[in-house]
Amino acid sequence: MIGFRAALAAVIAVSAALLAPLEARADKLSDIISKGVVRVSVFADVPPFGSLNANRELEGFDIDMAKLVAKAMGVKLELVQVPAASRIPFLMTDKVDMNIAAMSITAERALQVMFSAPYADTSLAVFGSKSLGVASGADLGKNRIVVAKGTTEDLVLTALAPKADIMRTEDNATAVQAYLSGHAQLLAANSVVVVELAKRNPDKEFDFKFALRRAPAHITIRRGEHDLLRWLDTLIFQSTLNGDLDELHRKWLGGPMRPLPPM
């Protein structure tokens, strides 16, 4: 009997040691619900996804999407403003729980973060004045093209035209300002964002030159948080069925939600 008890005690001790790391590392979904707050990184300079209104309040498609997430979780929402290049670093250093800032998927990014199902449909392209005869990456020549560093358009443009005169800025607002002021002849940006820019800057031409790629937006989280990812996918599926995402597309993107490609 003593031998049996000693063996049982040893098994229990080993089991406790194995389970301890799992218990110490709470899963992110449970952690958010336990704390009662979800921290979401968003843009403050990329209308209509995220920008500051006249009252200096954040508004836009991604802001409303973050509110939808917080409401469905039953927690408070903490919005964290980030430039494009800081979206993944903020996730990796646990400054935010998730990123909802018009991020499109790439294989390189997937080495660092996990992507939810797509929640918004957009595309990336190059724009400039009507007088510029640019119809592809091969036509860029000596024309300087500006892009926000770390964005998908930066990655695609660099691969497409590595020898082009690419001006990379720290954030989207600076990239737009460089184009508006004439420091760059072309702008690589999200087509939905450019529609909004054209409305706000009627004296500047935003003529479509060529497409870079279709770029649906995804919520991103840290790798390994599978429970949170499954929950986000469920929310996006539900919001597609009940019309919430279509409503956001009509409100912010100017039209109905098109069918999005599966992951």
Predicted regions and their residues:
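Extracytoplasmic small-molecule ligand-binding "clamshell" domains
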Residues: 27-102, 111
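Short loop->beta-strand "edge-of-pocket" segments that line small-molecule binding or catalytic clefts
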Residues: 36-42, 137-151, 165
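Ligand-binding cleft/hinge of the Venus flytrap
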Residues: 52-54, 66-75, 116, 137, ...
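Short beta-strand-to-loop elements that line the ligand-binding cleft
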Residues: 76-83, 147, 164-175
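A ligand-binding cleft/hinge motif common to bilobed small-molecule-binding domains
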Residues: 86-89, 103-111, 156-159, 180-181, ...
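Flexible hinge/capping segments at coil-to-helix
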Residues: 119, 128-145
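Periplasmic-binding protein-like
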Residues: 120-128, 174, 191, 195-237, ...
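Ligand-binding clefts/hinges and TM-proximal coupling segments of bilobed small-molecule sensing domains
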Residues: 152-169, 206-208, 236-263
